[in-house]
């Protein structure tokens, strides 16, 4: 196994001065993923309910989505981001709480867009669950 050399220099993440970007909130029934990108789509920061330490059914809660959004938002603010455009995708319970969390930590939200994919009668859906 390779060992880290003593006194080896590690590359520090450089601060990108980006004023505005896009927050993609993907909320499923099981988890909530928040990715903050610049206007070209290059990823700046991300967070998810699972990455925050929530496991199992706790990942699908609005509180977990709020914590994930705060984490991703603070990382993006470290790069100088202040203005956000928000794109929501999916049917999950963490959509609104993630959006509120981003607004609460000081982002200027210009507009909110729902980009949930809706089929024009495409693939056959999975069969109904019988519990």
From Swiss-Prot:
- Per its record, how is this protein called by name? Small ribosomal subunit protein uS11
Entry-linked InterPro entries: Ribosomal_uS11 (IPR001971), Ribosomal_uS11_bac-type (IPR019981), Ribosomal_uS11_CS (IPR018102), Ribosomal_uS11_sf (IPR036967)
Species of the source: Magnetococcus marinus (strain ATCC BAA-1437 / JCM 17883 / MC-1)
Q: Name one GO cellular component term.
A: ribonucleoprotein complex
What family is reported?
A: Belongs to the universal ribosomal protein uS11 family.
NCBIfam families linked: PRK05309.1, uS11_bact
Q: What does this protein do?
A: Located on the platform of the 30S subunit, it bridges several disparate RNA helices of the 16S rRNA. Forms part of the Shine-Dalgarno cleft in the 70S ribosome.
Q: Name one GO biological process term.
A: translation
Keywords, A to Z? Answer: Ribonucleoprotein, Ribosomal protein, RNA-binding, rRNA-binding
Q: Which GO terms describe its molecular function?
A: rRNA binding; structural constituent of ribosome
Q: How does it assemble?
A: Part of the 30S ribosomal subunit. Interacts with proteins S7 and S18. Binds to IF-3.
Per UniProt, what is the name of the gene that codes for the protein in this document? rpsK
